[in-house]
């Protein structure tokens, strides 16, 4: 009995120890399960949920989840704070979703595309949409460094976006500033279409004085371009402007109609002709394959910078000038009833015409316009009595003349320069206009020069290149309520392509560089007694004509250095666009590469 008394407390003590151990182990396993539940809530819920069991209401699940969070908060307050922050973030995301959906529905399609590109750019790792649970796992698993990294990526994206926007703005401003900085260059896009149909078009360049007041003296001069397909005719018309036309592509037959006679001329590439104001004329393209391109310098008579064409026929593009007269005037003029005049000259406007007549008119309506197609028989009749231009000898007072009929005034292996001055041609004498035609070979340079009096309007006929024009820009500054002008030397440059126009003001030095064979047509305004002064070259160089003492006083270098520098260029008027030193370096580089290759081959073989 006494022995059992001794063993009983020992047994109780052992049982107590076992109980405490069991409790400790249970607590440890419970904490581990809680951590697992916290890390993988989706998997835990999936394991606990019986597939045969009916799904519980969403409200009940939220209550149970809230209860578990409170228990975890009691065990670990910091973890509870994180959970509350996550809940707040989740609630904010849930509130943002409807707004985003509404914005996506309201914004246009291209805006959505840009937004998707932006999202892909600053979130490159996010390849597919994620569920809310996956996002929570990603947020819970990420450390503070990953949050900093995502913020850094976002900042990087915004910086890249700002740089891209600034670059686009800079490019736009550059293009705008180019147009503003160089008012002397007009691309082919600056033409305005007056008439167009499937047979051709007539375009007019914008006014020269719209860009700068320095070209006010050109407000009464316009450039017109006429293009037509093979076997077409521009209908008869007269204009309140004098024309000087030049054929730049194809062949043409132009007919000049006067009250007492009619004269037809065959024109080819480079032929020019003056058409006086008020003269009725029409132009035929007799070629079967080649398009016709004619450029005209128009000099308005009635209104500076504006001129109008008057057609005797009515088309979809232009009304007949006969339609402007009253019925009584027309009947008295032709001594015929108005209905007959309308049928013959103006066209039938009867609204009661039948279906067949309407269909026939609709079919012919497609061919109506100021440029129409002609048959082979009609072409032969129109060209039967036509004369050709004079290639050699003295130009006629009314017939066409070719710009390259005489020898070029400047010529070498790099180019040719032809000119017809008012003194040499009676057709342009009273207009005080000269015509030039320049051929610059690929890789050649028309040396810097300037014109003493003439303002030249230059049309790029063929090829590509660039030019540099040196002018003076006035800068006005107001100091002490007095306006002062500062003169600054300015370079105006532009790329040249076919159809472009550029202006060379009098006194402005210019040089032209040809990246391919370049052909230029020039109209010189105020050309009488104009003198062309070259600034470099072995001949006609005004700098070389300066006295030695003046050279000494004018330039930083000595007169001897200036003369030696001028003599370095042995060509005149046209020269190689690449400096001789650069060519020598390129030759030495090619020679070195060849020697290196030969040494490598000799080593191998």
From Swiss-Prot:
Keyword Glycoprotein set for record: yes
Species whose genome carries this gene: Lupinus angustifolius
Region (Disordered): 37-193, 346-367, 382-405, 574-593
Entry keyword Chloroplast: no
Glycosylation sites recorded in the entry for this protein: 406, 513
Compositional bias (Basic and acidic residues): 37-105, 150-179
Cupin type-1 domain segment(s): 184-342, 401-563
Its job: Seed storage protein. Accumulates during seed development and is hydrolyzed after germination to provide a carbon and nitrogen source for the developing seedling.
Low complexity bias: start-end ranges: 140-149
UniProt-listed CDD domains: cupin_7S_vicilin-like_C, cupin_7S_vicilin-like_N
InterPro entries: Cupin_1 (IPR006045), RmlC-like_jellyroll (IPR014710), RmlC_Cupin_sf (IPR011051), Seed_Storage-Functional (IPR050253)
Membership in a protein family: Belongs to the 7S seed storage protein family.
Pfam family name, one: Cupin_1
This protein's UniProt keywords: Allergen, Glycoprotein, Seed storage protein, Signal, Storage protein
Other comment: The variability of the residues taking part of IgE-binding epitopes might be responsible of the difference in cross-reactivity among legumes.
Domain of life: Eukaryota
Name of the protein: Conglutin beta 7
């Amino acid at each position: 009995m006494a022995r059992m008394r001794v063993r009983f407390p020992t047994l109780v003590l052992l049982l107590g120890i076992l109980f405490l151990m069991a409790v400790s182990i249970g607590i440890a396993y419970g904490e581990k399960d809680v951590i697992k539940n916290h890390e993988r809530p989706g998997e835990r819920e999936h394991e606990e949920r019986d597939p045969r069991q009916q799904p519980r209401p969403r409200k009940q699940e939220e209550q149970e989840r809230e209860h578990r969070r409170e228990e975890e908060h009691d065990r670990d307050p910091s973890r509870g704070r994180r959970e509350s922050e996550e809940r707040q973030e989740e609630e904010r995301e849930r509130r943002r979703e409807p707004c985003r959906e509404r914005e996506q529905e309201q914004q246009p399609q291209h805006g959505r595309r840009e937004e998707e590109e932006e999202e892909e750019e600053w979130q490159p790792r996010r390849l597919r949409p994620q569920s809310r649970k996956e996002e929570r796992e990603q947020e819970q698993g990420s450390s503070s460094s990953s949050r900093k990294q995502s913020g850094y990526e976002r900042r990087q994206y915004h910086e890249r976006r700002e740089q891209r926007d600034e670059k686009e703005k800079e490019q736009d401003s550059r293009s705008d500033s180019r147009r503003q900085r160089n008012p002397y260059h007009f691309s082919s896009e600056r033409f305005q279409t007056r008439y167009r149909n499937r047979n051709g078009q007539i375009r007019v360049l914008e006014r020269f004085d719209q860009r700068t007041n320095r070209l006010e003296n050109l407000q009464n001069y316009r450039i017109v371009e006429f293009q037509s397909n093979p076997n077409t005719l521009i209908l008869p018309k007269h204009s309140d402007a004098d024309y000087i036309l030049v054929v730049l592509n194809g062949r043409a037959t132009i007919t000049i109609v006067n009250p007492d006679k009619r004269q037809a001329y065959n024109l080819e590439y480079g032929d020019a002709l003056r058409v006086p104001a008020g003269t009725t004329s029409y132009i035929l393209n007799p070629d079967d394959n080649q398009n016709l391109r004619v450029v005209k310098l128009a000099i308005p008579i009635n209104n500076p910078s504006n001129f109008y064409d008057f057609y005797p026929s009515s088309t979809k593009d232009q009304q007949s000038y006969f339609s402007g007269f009253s019925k009584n005037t027309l009947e008295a003029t032709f001594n015929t009833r108005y209905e007959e005049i309308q049928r013959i000259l103006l066209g039938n406007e009867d609204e009661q015409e039948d279906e067949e007549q309407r269909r026939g008119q609709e079919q012919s309506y497609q061919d109506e316009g100021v440029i129409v197609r002609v048959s082979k028989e009609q072409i032969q009749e129109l060209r039967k009595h036509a004369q050709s231009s004079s290639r050699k000898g003295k130009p006629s007072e009314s017939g066409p003349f070719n710009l390259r009929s005489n020898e070029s005034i400047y010529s070498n292996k790099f180019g040719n320069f032809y000119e017809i001055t008012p003194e040499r041609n009676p057709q342009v004498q009273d207009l005080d206009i000269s015509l030039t035609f320049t051929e610059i070979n690929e890789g050649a340079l028309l040396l810097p020069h300037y014109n003493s009096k003439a303002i030249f309007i230059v049309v790029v006929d063929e090829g590509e290149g660039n030019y540099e024009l040196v002018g003076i820009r006035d800068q006005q500054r107001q100091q002490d309520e007095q306006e002062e002008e500062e003169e600054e030397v300015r370079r105006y440059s532009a790329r040249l392509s076919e159809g472009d126009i550029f202006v060379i003001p009098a006194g402005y030095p210019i040089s032209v560089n040809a990246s391919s064979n370049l052909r230029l047509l020039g109209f010189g305004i105020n050309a009488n007694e104009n003198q062309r002064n070259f600034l470099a070259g072995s001949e006609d160089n005004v700098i070389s004509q300066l006295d030695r003492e003046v050279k000494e006083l004018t330039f930083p270098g000595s007169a001897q250095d200036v003369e030696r520098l001028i003599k370095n260029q042995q060509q005149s008027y046209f020269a190689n666009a690449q400096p001789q030193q650069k060519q020598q370096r390129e030759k030495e580089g090619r020679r070195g590469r060849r020697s290196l290759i030969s040494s490598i081959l000799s080593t191998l073989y």
